[in-house]
């Protein structure tokens, strides 16, 4: 039995949820998100809560129900509050600059790295070494942050590179003679 799927999702004020043909759509101040629910599951909208219907004896439905509930909850939080990931650049000469929907990164390569920001995501640079990725879809925000980090992942000896703001880099000791 999935413990996550048993919890109903409360819908905050300002968020409108509709269910049609296995597609759940949430509309709020941060935009519109929709997600297809697996055919073997059911979704009920009662009052201000959303709940998942599933067969508790079926192992596949148990797994799908918990995941679907988490995805729907993230969708509702995304259209009401949004999600953000903060990244920081550590290294001499490493800097970032956002120009419209293009993020320009100087990461020690012979050329600047130009990253095209996908629709639905906003990238801000409060300072030259800080990047903030914001959006309504949690999965897309996390993927964009991971793509930016992948250009120059932090190395373990000096810790230089692009890292998440809350990330701790485990450092290695230099080779001894």
UniProtKB/Swiss-Prot annotation:
Pfam families, A to Z: Ribosomal_L6
GO MF terms, alphabetically ordered: rRNA binding; structural constituent of ribosome
Gene3D superfamilies: Ribosomal protein L6, alpha-beta domain
GO BP annotations, alphabetical order: cytoplasmic translation
Entry superkingdom: Bacteria
Any coiled-coil regions, as ranges: none
Gene Ontology CC terms, in alphabetical order: cytosolic large ribosomal subunit
Keywords on record: Ribonucleoprotein, Ribosomal protein, RNA-binding, rRNA-binding
Functional note: This protein binds to the 23S rRNA, and is important in its secondary structure. It is located near the subunit interface in the base of the L7/L12 stalk, and near the tRNA binding site of the peptidyltransferase center.
Family as reported in the entry's similarity comment: Belongs to the universal ribosomal protein uL6 family.
Binding partners and assembly: Part of the 50S ribosomal subunit.
Protein name: Large ribosomal subunit protein uL6
Protein's organism: Methylococcus capsulatus (strain ATCC 33009 / NCIMB 11132 / Bath)
Protein encoded by which gene: rplF
């Amino acid at each position: 039995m999935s413990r996550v799927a048993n919890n109903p999702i409360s819908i905050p004020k300002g968020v409108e949820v509709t269910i049609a043909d296995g597609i759940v759509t949430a509309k709020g101040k941060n935009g519109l998100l929709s997600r297809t629910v697996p055919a073997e599951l059911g979704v009920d909208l009662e009052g201000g809560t959303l709940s998942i219907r599933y067969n508790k004896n079926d192992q596949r439905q148990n797994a799908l129900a918990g995941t679907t509930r988490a995805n729907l909850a993230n969708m509702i939080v995304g259209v009401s509050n949004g999600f953000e990931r903060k990244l920081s650049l550590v290294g001499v000469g490493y800097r970032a600059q956002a120009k419209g929907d293009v993020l320009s990164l100087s990461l020690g390569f012979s050329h600047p790295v130009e990253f095209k920001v996908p629709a639905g995501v906003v990238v801000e640079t409060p300072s030259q070494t800080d990047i903030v990725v914001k959006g309504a879809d949690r999965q897309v925000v996390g993927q964009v942050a991971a793509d930016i980090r992948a250009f120059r992942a932090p190395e373990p000896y000096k810790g230089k590179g692009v890292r998440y703001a809350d990330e701790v880099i485990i450092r290695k000791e230099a080779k001894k003679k």
